[in-house]
Amino acid sequence: MRTITLIVVHCTANKAGSTLRVKDIDRYHRSLGWKGCGYHYVIPTDGTIEKGRAEDLVGAHCKNHNKHSIGVAYVGGLDADGKTPKDTRTPEQKIALWKLIKELKERYPKALVVGHCDLDPRKPFCPGFKVHGGQSSDHRNLDGFRRMVFGDCLSARCFGAARAEGKHAFTMPSRDKTNHR
């Protein structure tokens, strides 16, 4: 079993509104000669949580930190022109990111939650928002992370808005260990 010390949040660096799914990322990463999707989880714009690489496998998402981290990416990160970094997370993605991080923190309570930019100065705009959220570098504080994820939107309003619009339930994918990519 791997020792997980980091949960690294990424964006996929796609235009706002992209319909990219984990299968598309998997295909692209394989075209680069990788073993499959480098992220452990991907959150498309509709807020589903899609499983990429199995958690027990080393990811391919953050140089020098893959062996001890879980990689989570939301689809987006660029504005409509595809050139300018921007926080393009939908309300559904914000809710899903919060739920996923909360679940991961239950499994890996000592892991720190960081943005890709916090570990790699060559990626200053990934994930497109400030993961620190004004909090200390100790991201064990889930309440601080919740405020960062939702920004100006109170979590209750986001959850309520999603429910009022009849959005699907946000559930974790199964942790089937046979999905080795």
Task: Go through each PLM region and give its residues.
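Gly/Ser/Thr-rich helix-start
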Residues: C37, R53, A60, G77, ...
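Short amphipathic alpha-helices and their capping/turn segments at secondary-structure boundaries
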Residues: D56-K63, K102
